[in-house]
Amino acid sequence: MHYDFKKVEQDIQKKWNFYTDVKKAQCYVLEMFPYPSGNIHMGHLRNYTIGDVIARYKRACGINVFHPIGWDAFGLPAENAALSYNINPQTWTKNNIDNMRCQLKSIGLSYDWNKELATCDADYYKHEQAFFLDFLKCGLAYRKESLVNWDPIDQTVLANEQVIDGKGWRSGAVVEKRKLSQWFLKITDFAEELLNDLKVLDKWPEKVKLMQERWIGRSEGVVVDFEILNINKTLQVFTTCPHTLFGASFIAVSFDHPILQCVSDSDIIQQINDFDKNNLITDASSTVEKFGINSGLVVKHPFLCMNLPVYVVNFVLMDYATGAVFGCPAHDQRDFEFAKKYNLQIKQVVFPEIDIDLGKEAYVGSGTMKNSDFLDGMTVDEAKEAMIAKLQLLGIGDKMTYYRIHDWGISRQRYWGCPIPIIYCEKCGTVPVSRKDLPVTLPQDVDFTKSGNPLDNHPTWKYVKCPSCGMDAERETDTFDTFFESSWYFAAFCGTSSGIDKDTCNMLLPVDYYIGGIEHAVLHLLYSRFFCRALTKCGYFNVKEPFSSLITQGMVCHATYSDAQGNYLFPEEARKMMEEGQHVNVGRAEKMSKSKKNVVNLEYIIDKYGADTARLFILSDTPPDRDIEWLDDGIEGASKYLSKLWRMIVSYDQINLNFNVEDIPEDAIKYRRCVHKIVSDITSDLEFCRLNCAVAKFRELSNILSEMIRTSVNSDVVSEAICILIRVIEPFIPHIAEKLWENIGGKDMLWNQMWPKADTELLIERNVNIAVQVNGKFIRTLTVANNIDNDQLKSMALEMAKNKIGNSVVKNVYIIPKRAVNIVIEKLS
């Protein structure tokens, strides 16, 4: 009777094999693949279990499901490990993959392990090197200078996460902003398409689509030509508020705007060269103080007899629009703060109906135009159109659309990544590596103790012959951003070692169900959408969108604990201290994180309770897209449910797999109605990914089954209910379900059995409750047969309401089918 979960789970896992012929697949289920950090955590458990439930359910519906797994295996932690533990990143990564593979299998996930891939394998990244060469041909890849975080001690570029309080994570040196040549992909070529096609993603969360919409950031405005005094040049300025032009008091340009080459004052030139690039404002919500340098350049206002000074500022960037804006302090808060700081004019041109105080903040609402010459008296919308027309008429301005999104910088000065297949030759310039020489692989004999990029420091690897002229040349020593690998892996699963299979991709993509965290909304998910379009343009397949349905699971949270000194404690440490009577501060539930120590070891949970218990808890109570709080009582409750379920079914000795439910007593029919109603509900819940609701329903079914057994309901009806229960719990708690199926004599593996279909006849309600009303006021509820005719229903309602009607005249009787009867009366005068 005892449920030995360890024995059951180990036994069942040996029997599973979820191989799928990808060319025959009908449904593609994919979770965001993990970085092989070494251990699976609770967030992984939730992510992968949600996907596994969907995959198992779809298989049970007779659908050929493709459910692969792989490893996002390049990345900075492997280099950090190489430095800390004196181990090769390849070895560190492989060991972690081996460990995490065992952990994933222990959870009981129905993956097709035959399609397993790792992005650090040359057989994988040789294809993306080929993509890059094709992107070059199609004009989707290019090289230019861009700002990077530069560590002057280690002589290397740092990722943003490696800059801690403005200093390099390893050297402690103050990080500088430098311009270096970097490779870029032209995601901006698809900006309009990426934005517009969000409308067709009707199975994506609205929040994710809104985040992408804002990230792409379409801005419709006007480019205005300002004449620069004394140097016979014009400065193009972009604005989305042309109606405020009469309120302009200065021009703001990026620190690297080409017009600054016209500055002649040596002191100002020195100030510009010393410009603090570390405090650039790249986000409108930034709290970084706004500052500027008067360049000495002056432009002429196009409509007023006044000149505007040109400031070099930290809140305008060259890679957005024209790199120049005009400042209207009265109607833009950023400009207002800048004008206050530098004592610039603040001129109001938009006036609301109520007087406002411009002494504290800018006014950004609607109103009537004043102090604006030919715009006076107009509304804001009218003034915008009138100003655009005037600028066009004078030939000094025109409509323009820009996007906030920038081209994707893919160069990383790191070792553990995919080498960029480029060679630099003094004679031939930039030369792509020949396709026959792909893949360009990483050297294994690298030294991580030296500062700088290990590839750049390697004594031999970067020195090659030019493929064009045969002269001495050097390899590109940068590697791809790791988002490059994760932007196409969903297509790699559809291919072979020979590359992407065009026909299979066209058939199977987009992925039907994609599950992962919302934190990837504007990087991985957007880059993947771009990659589909880029690969389509290059002829690899014809797929616009990578993911049809997106499920963003919530975080797994846990209370935080700290001692009297504020030091964080692990949950087990906190428990022990509380048992000893020591004071422990209990904080609110937050996302599990190593830094706050509010983590629960998944291996410990599986060892103590089993995978099915962990799966059941993580799927219970909370919708998949909401955060879930880890509670010890919850995991204990899930464990007790499984033990009770096991005992109930194993102890029933009248099971009959050839049950006959035709001629059964009325009390048994009542139970069948309940069972089939729950089957219908669970099926609906699974179709709409209401997994927590489905769990609640099958637990309800367990209670009904327990009552049926206790009251000795017809054994055939009980047998049917047992078979149904075992089948519907399988996607959620597959080990115990599979073993129970085996114990009752089920043939073949349970996951191969079809999903139970609810008997529609049993779903028809025999009786319905009808609200009886008089003049719209509720009187009583009438319970009648579901198929009662209207005349009979009318008669019964009138009889029930006769005391209320009294001597009044019945004017009409309205029947709302299966819901209400409203008797309209008129009292006698």
UniProtKB/Swiss-Prot annotation:
Q: Where is this motif: 'HIGH' region?
A: 34-44
Quote the cellular component terms of the Gene Ontology held in the record: cytosol
The answer, when asked if Transit peptide is one of the entry's keywords, is no
InterPro entries per record = aa-tRNA-synth_I_CS (IPR001412), aa-tRNA-synth_Ia (IPR002300), Leu-tRNA-ligase (IPR002302), Leu_tRNA-synth_edit (IPR025709), M/V/L/I-tRNA-synth_anticd-bd (IPR013155), Methionyl/Leucyl_tRNA_Synth (IPR015413), Rossmann-like_a/b/a_fold (IPR014729), tRNAsynth_Ia_anticodon-bd (IPR009080)
Coiled-coil ranges per the record? none
| E.C. designation(s) | 6.1.1.4
Q: What class of enzyme is it?
A: ligase
Question: Which GO biological process annotations does it have?
Answer: leucyl-tRNA aminoacylation
Q: Which GO terms describe its molecular function?
A: aminoacyl-tRNA deacylase activity; ATP binding; leucine-tRNA ligase activity
Q: Which residues does the annotation say bind ATP? A: K594
Q: Does the keyword Disulfide bond apply?
A: no
Q: Tell me where it mainly resides.
A: cytoplasm
What keywords would UniProt list here? Aminoacyl-tRNA synthetase, ATP-binding, Cytoplasm, Ligase, Nucleotide-binding, Protein biosynthesis
- Renumbered to this chain, motif 'KMSKS' region spans 591-595
UniProt cross-references to Pfam families, sorted A to Z: Anticodon_1, tRNA-synt_1, tRNA-synt_1_2, tRNA-synt_1g
Instruction: Please write the reaction equations for the catalytic activity of this protein.
Output: tRNA(Leu) + L-leucine + ATP = L-leucyl-tRNA(Leu) + AMP + diphosphate
Q: Where is the protein localized?
A: Cytoplasm
Family label: Belongs to the class-I aminoacyl-tRNA synthetase family.
The record's section on PANTHER family has: LEUCINE--TRNA LIGASE, MITOCHONDRIAL, LEUCYL-TRNA SYNTHETASE
Name of the molecule in the record: Leucine--tRNA ligase
**Organism phylogeny:** Bacteria, Pseudomonadati, Pseudomonadota, Alphaproteobacteria, Rickettsiales
Protein's gene: leuS
